[in-house]
């Protein structure tokens, strides 16, 4: 029996896309013979699913489960938007968020582990990669959520108020995507960058103007920037006459937090060359 070295495990992982522990188990069972391990994994159906792990999954869905006091929000990715609309994928997402909520999970790793068998079955059936990407559990005095087409999900927590108010504010967050809750959370560096950009863009307008006038112009831009970036300072989408922060105060509530998930956020999608894609399809058709 050949020694099961880290290098051997790494090679099998690179060739199959399977996890380190699964590769080690397969090599042990195969007596250290990597080719036999691959054959065994193919026979079990594991590789058919895992080989697709190299494909970028940047589409998918956001799902939320809440009960007014707690919520779980997850992102599950697929390679194509078409799959994200299919019942098999939707059922997997629904089962995953139910599991996460029922088990009060606060980290995505246990959910990935718990759903791995179901994921492999799904991948083997649909022929493309599927990943549970992230999860967050939120608890509070009042918790409300909003889903926009399963592509954007928001959870808002309040101190005071009610679930309907939290849902309204969550809907606003989905539409406006604020960076911060309060203006005080905006870093000095961000403000300085905004000042610098403003001065560069308006170089001709401020040339020759007194320093105090320039200062007022910059101050006006920063005030607008803070209003655009901070949830409590934004005009409420349902009634632009009132700020979101004032809306909450009027209802005797305080906004404690918001969580915003968007499908594919931060995932680098491959840019396909259309000509190459057509050429590849024509070549495949001739075989």
Swiss-Prot record:
Gene Ontology annotations for the cellular component aspect, listed alphabetically: cytoplasm
Role: Associates with the EF-Tu.GDP complex and induces the exchange of GDP to GTP. It remains bound to the aminoacyl-tRNA.EF-Tu.GTP complex up to the GTP hydrolysis stage on the ribosome.
Family: Belongs to the EF-Ts family.
Pfam family, one: EF_TS
GO MF terms held by the record: translation elongation factor activity
InterPro entries, A to Z: EF-Ts_dimer_sf, Transl_elong_EFTs/EF1B, Transl_elong_EFTs/EF1B_dimer, Transl_elong_Ts_CS, UBA-like_sf
Region entry Involved in Mg(2+) ion dislocation from EF-Tu, spans: 80-83
CDD domains in the record: UBA_EF-Ts
Keywords: Cytoplasm, Elongation factor, Protein biosynthesis
The keyword Protease appears for this protein: no
Cell location: Cytoplasm
HAMAP family found in the cross-reference section: EF_Ts
Name recorded for this polypeptide: Elongation factor Ts
UniProt superkingdom: Bacteria
Principal localisation: cytoplasm
PROSITE patterns tied to this protein: EF_TS_1 (PS01126), EF_TS_2 (PS01127)
């Amino acid at each position: 029996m050949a020694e099961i070295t880290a290098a051997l495990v790494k090679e099998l992982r690179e060739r199959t896309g399977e996890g380190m522990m699964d590769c080690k188990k397969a090599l042990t069972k195969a007596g250290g013979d990597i080719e036999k391990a691959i054959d065994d994994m193919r026979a079990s159906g594991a590789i058919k699913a895992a080989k697709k792990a190299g494909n970028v999954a940047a589409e998918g869905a956001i799902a939320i489960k809440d009960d007014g006091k707690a919520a779980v929000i997850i992102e599950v990715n697929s390679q194509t938007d078409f799959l994200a609309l299919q019942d098999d994928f939707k059922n997997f997402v629904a089962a995953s968020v139910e599991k996460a909520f029922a088990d009060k999970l606060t980290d995505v790793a246990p959910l990935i582990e718990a759903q791995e068998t179901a994921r492999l079955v799904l991948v083997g059936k649909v022929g493309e990669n599927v990943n549970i990407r992230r999860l967050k559990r939120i608890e509070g005095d009042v918790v409300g959520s909003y889903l926009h087409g399963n592509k954007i999900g928001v959870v808002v927590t309040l101190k005071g108020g009610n679930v309907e108010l939290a849902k309204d504010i969550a809907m606003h967050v989905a539409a406006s995507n604020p960076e911060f809750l309060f203006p005080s959370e905006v870093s000095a560096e961000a403000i300085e960058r905004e000042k610098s950009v403003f001065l560069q863009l308006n170089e001709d307008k401020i040339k020759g103007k007194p320093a105090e006038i320039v200062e007022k112009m910059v101050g006006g831009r920063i005030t607008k920037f803070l209003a655009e970036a901070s949830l409590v300072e934004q005009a409420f989408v349902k009634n632009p006459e009132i700020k979101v922060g004032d809306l909450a105060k009027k209802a005797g509530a305080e906004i404690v937090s918001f969580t915003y998930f968007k499908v594919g956020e931060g995932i680098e999608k491959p840019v396909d060359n259309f000509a190459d894609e057509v050429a590849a399809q024509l070549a495949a058709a001739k075989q």
